[in-house]
Amino acid sequence: MSASPVILIADDEPLLTELLEFRLGARGYQTVVAHDGREALAKLEEAEPQAVVLDMMMPVHDGLEVLRRIRASAVHAQTPVIMLTARRGEADVIGALELGADDYLVKPFLPEELLVRLARLLAGKKL
């Protein structure tokens, strides 16, 4: 088997990105971190991650704009995306799923739940 999966974490909260880097690293994932939407799109091209954990409310480009661009990309359109956000409104959840998010998790969240959802997506299983 090749190298461990690379996960792009796009969130503007440094403590959260550190937590996710630690938890994902402990499970054998490699991580790449972006703190705004523009950086997330650049890291997507550089790192070619196998999945993206994406905050909805970030500076420069918000998570929905990043998701739109991922789904419009010939290269990355099939990359699994989990939205991880404090926005819990029905319109937010439905809007993200309609744009192509594979999963949606509301903060505060259980890190173990995120890990299970991520593993299922990487294995090609939908919840």
Which role does the model predict for each range below?
Residues 17, 58-60, 77, 89, ...:
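The feature encodes the CheY-like receiver
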Residues 33-51:
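Acidic, metal-coordinating helix/loop segments flanking the phosphotransfer/catalytic sites
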Residues 35-39, 55, 62-68:
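Acidic catalytic/metal-coordinating carboxylates
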Residues 65, 88-103, 116:
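Alpha4 helix (beta4-alpha4-beta5 surface) of REC/receiver domains from two-component response regulators
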